[in-house]
Amino acid sequence: MSEFLLIVHVLAAATWIGASVLTGFAGPRMAREGGPAALGWARVSREASLKVFNPAAGLTALSGILLVVLGDDYDWSDSFVTIGLTVVVITGIIGSVVHRPDAQKIIAALESSDYPTATEAGKRAAIWGALTIALLIVTVSVMVMKTGAG
């Protein structure tokens, strides 16, 4: 069971990070295209948060928790477990407080041709997105190294 959970954990984290990197790469390029391309990308990104990011993050957290609860290899006192859970909480807050409202703001601004507002919100989303990616990369690193494992 623990091997299956570990596979699920790794695949979910890879999906989460991969989608984040793709969004960080494609988002600014689509924004520079402007008009319908930028609006289409903004809508796809908002939908991806509900259908890709949130499920991948949730599955990463759930499978990680189950690895600790059901297995003997990991413990709540392991630093990498604490770091992983902390990053899930932090990125959840970033998603709720920054990404979700900014996505709505970008879409509304693009729909009304308010490009300065869309650009400002897009830059803010890009900065917080880069921070999220950095947090996820650090988390994967401490997971692989099993930092602080008992």
What is each stretch, according to the model?
Residues M1-G150:
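Polytopic transmembrane helical bundles with strong interfacial aromatic enrichment
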